[in-house]
Amino acid sequence: MYEEPLLLLRQEVQEPGIYSAIIEAIAGGATRSNEISTKIDEEPAKCLKYIKILCELGILYKEVPFGEKQTSRKTIYGISDFMFRFWYRYVFTNRSLIETGAQDAILKKRIQPTYSDYMGLVFEKICSDYLMLQNIRGNLPILFTKIGRWWGSDSASHSQAEIDIVANEGKDYLICECKWRNEKLDLSVLKGLKEKADAFMKKRNNTWYVLFSKSGFTDAVTNEAQNDDHIILVDLHDIINLK
């Protein structure tokens, strides 16, 4: 397991060093092709060629904001293989320390402080899979035909906004927020999600707000959902017990 990602990479490509550097850059937070090429000090065109190969191998994925063309200038890249993602985030960068036996210190100082952030994207994937299964079973308010993430500018707040999951059937939408944290999800998250939904698209027929939370919801959120059937709450228990 310790060397497996590198061994797999060496089996698939002829220049594992540059491919490994690209994956490491993405694991470290560089997601746009120009950011990645700058991080690894490689020509943008050459770097993009290597990125496309990693996408073809299923190690990376290409993503554009929901509703935009595949040629969008907002394209980002991520690590689709979760073993590669964890290994390059926490193992590869700490190899010298691991080899000195400092595993406990690495866990305390390098992994635990950032693990909730790391799990955020993993939880989004779990929530997306949950929605797709419920969609197949006809258990959602809409039968969506498309699902993805959205990010872009919020003209009202003059800032960048991101929606974890968007799914639609025509002009009817599911707008979703996924929270992997130890605190219960509160009303401020719901309010923020509604604001981001307007930044994404103001002209919608019907919108259901789906809140996913690792640690449940405050009473205020629960009461809000009981009085509004366009608010759907899903906690970790619901996901784990889905059959």
Give names to the regions the model predicted.
Residues 75-243:
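A cross-kingdom feature that marks ATP-driven nucleic-acid transaction machinery
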Residues 1-84, 88:
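Interdomain hinge/linker elements that couple catalytic modules in large macromolecular machines
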